[in-house]
Curated annotation (Swiss-Prot):
GO MF annotation list: thymidylate synthase activity
Similarity remark: Belongs to the thymidylate synthase family. Bacterial-type ThyA subfamily.
Subunit structure: Homodimer.
EC code(s) of this entry: 2.1.1.45
Designated gene of the protein: thyA
Record-given protein name: Thymidylate synthase
Native organism: Oceanobacillus iheyensis (strain DSM 14371 / CIP 107618 / JCM 11309 / KCTC 3954 / HTE831)
Annotated binding of dUMP, by residue: R24, R179, R180, R219, S220, A221, D222, N230, H260, I261, Y262
Length: 317
């Protein structure tokens, strides 16, 4: 099964055969191991239609990765809050933090309305300081050796760096039949310094008949909240690299390790499964820019996107 139906079938499969498991966040999940879905990128841009997926958040996060940035300040400047909780956790667990107790803020904010008000107030103060205070942003806005660092500045044992993204684009242009068009974000040495070890760990490109395809291996997949973003993000990355390399797009193949639905997302997924699939939108890339490294948010436009309404759900931190 291709396209959005494959995603919905994954949700159904997790409900049908998934194992109930504990997890790092103490939320609990329904989980399966080993699954694959596929999208033909010539049949529209895979921004799910059974709920609204905010394209500008997807695009600004990807551009953040592409820039090699690891500080949430760039994201906040683009009204993107999807990484805030991990930076905030570092702040409230530090000796410098003197505010109210924020232990287990992810779960407590869902269960305690009074605490949630405190949490929201502290988060807004944190965001403001990140945007306005350079030294504070340098210390508490940085997430460590996460995706952007590994993609663009992988450290070697020789104290040199490897720009994996630049190298893979060069490889696609000069040796399209290579089986080594690979970028890895999983660096065992750096795992302890990351705010969150990479969930989408490795991707590989494949050129055939003038078309560029991409396969992603994702070790851990939050199927309701994260996976719709991941699908759109790697589809966008494939489009951008194809654009630079003078290729058409082929398939995006999404391979999962632990694919799970959090216990507090079950009702939301059930709502989504009741909705009818609509046509995918189209992606328009500014033709006046060629290099992926020159792209800005305004160079990427989605047209004819007509999704069902968004479905809110808590994030597990």
């Amino acid at each position: 099964m291709l396209g959005e139906q494959a995603y919905l079938d994954l949700c159904k499969q997790i409900f049908k055969t998934g194992e109930q498991r504990g997890d790092r966040t103490n939320t609990g999940t329904h989980s399966i191991f080993g699954h694959q879905i596929r999208f033909d990128l010539n049949k529209g841009f895979p921004l799910l239609t059974t709920k609204r997926v905010p394209f500008r958040l997807v695009a600004s996060e990807l551009l953040w990765f592409i820039k090699g940035d690891t500080n949430i300040r760039y994201l906040l400047k683009h009204n993107n809050n999807i990484w805030n909780e991990w930076a905030f956790e570092k702040w409230v667990n530090s000796a410098d933090y003197q505010g109210p107790d924020m232990a287990n803020f992810g779960l407590r904010s869902q269960k305690d309305e009074n605490f949630n008000k405190q949490y929201q107030e502290q988060m807004e103060l944190f965001k403001t300081r990140i945007l306005e205070d350079d030294s504070f942003a340098d210390k508490y806005g940085d997430l460590g050796s996460v995706y952007g660092k590994q993609w663009r500045n992988w450290k070697t044992t020789q104290n040199e760096t490897i720009d994996q993204l630049k190298d893979v684009i060069h490889s696609i242009k000069t040796n399209p039949n290579s089986r080594r068009h690979i970028v890895s974000a999983w660096n065992p040495e750096d795992i302890p310094t990351m705010a969150l070890p990479p969930c989408h760990t490795l991707f590989q490109f494949y050129v055939s008949n003038g078309k560029l395809s991409c396969q992603l291996y994702q070790r851990s997949a939050d199927v309701f909240l994260g996976v719709p973003f991941n699908i759109a993000s790697y589809a966008l990355l494939t489009h951008l690299i194809a654009h630079e390399c003078g290729l058409e797009v082929g398939d995006f193949v999404h391979t999962f390790g632990d694919a799970h639905i959090y216990s507090n997302h079950v009702e939301q997924v059930e709502t989504q499964l009741e909705r009818e699939i609509r046509d995918f939108p189209q992606l328009i890339i500014n033709k006046d820019k060629n290099s992926i490294f020159e792209m800005d948010l305004d160079d990427l436009v989605i047209e004819n996107y007509n999704p069902h309404p968004s479905i809110k759900a808590p994030i597990a931190v």
